[in-house]
């Protein structure tokens, strides 16, 4: 079957060209009509430049109307888009470009200066500045291509620091949109914008005819002030973000008009959710579980999830709810394997990660290792830590967080097996901590360092190094799974 994911966007862009599609606070909004004509300009530029269907286009631009118009244009002509984590080291970017060999490079001013640092990017012969591409009337249908043709290929650093490419093919983009819409019932809010920090949700919103308000990555107070000053028709009624942005938004005064709030991407303290419940008492809250490779995997009503987690004595919201119907799953003692139409295929450019995280069963079906330990009961799934962290250490962390009433520390195992507690605001409590938790062998005070991609997560490796503690390999990279052949389960089964 031949498809093109841009067809979803066109259904609404043709009918409502004047409707806001993308807005960065403090800047002029981009309409669906703007994205349509700018995307057609990009499509023609790529076709005239000789980029074939199935060819790859490197895109380096700040999130906003220009970037997403370029995505629309590239996908419409059957090309795939390559996005690279902006803080990836130059040598790693060089590896990515040599692996993918993009046929063209599209960039804005910031993206140009990011790219010219990399010899392999400078060597791309076809390059265009997005601001110089003229919008064109969109008079043609998107080119239909096989479902497995490249859509959006995103490279991140991965657990080991080695780049890994997550491919969202054309067919995948369509199915992910359908599953997200069904799971989160976003059709209730198609007439009003979504405030989001996740680009994949922006694409899904565009496919639904919804506008998206995107906050620049620095989350400056003036950007949040601009949000509150938006006209009524541009005020977001839903929020899709991680717990760090939710907390930042509440500290800045919040947005009173939010009616549905979707939080995922990292563990969330129960107290953050409870503060949000008080800020938006009438809003519905979703607790999302997923990953770059599959979004969503499971979801729960966040109020229910917090109550369930509190009942078990957890400091963080560990109840995940039920897997979405489109997911097949298998739980093992320390791993969760999933399969489904919106689970990304093998990684591009990282065979070590493929050996660790991908398996085919006897029927040839591909399964993905989420890297998490999941328990299940009659209510649903419970998160129990990463697969490479001993479960008793994860449970001990929850107990310590409850005692400290904060989650700014973690257990670090030494090669000898000894346990150190590393974190912020704990040095003066060492005597009390070791008396209360006698399995601790020491306490190391160090400032909190957050993960660059997931700002709610502690960067355990950097914090351990800052504390003068070398992290054993078992906490840097998950071990390779055994050669067990996986048997498929019924849809949605555990």
Could you tell me what each predicted segment is?
Residues 335-394:
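Conserved ATP-binding/catalytic segment of the ANL
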Residues 44-87, 191-196:
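Conserved AMP-binding/adenylate-forming
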Residues 20-50, 62-64, 89-94, 168-171:
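Conserved AMP-binding/adenylate-forming core of the ANL superfamily
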Residues 174-193, 198-238:
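Conserved AMP-binding/adenylation subdomain of ANL enzymes
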Residues 2-3, 17-18, 136-155, 162, ...:
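Conserved pre-ATP/AMP-binding loop-to-beta segment of ANL
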Residues 410-415, 419-420, 429-486:
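Conserved C-terminal "lid"/linker of ANL adenylate-forming enzymes
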Residues 236-238, 250-314:
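Gly/Ser/Thr-rich phosphate-binding loop
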Residues 29-33, 151-178, 211:
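Conserved AMP-binding A3 loop
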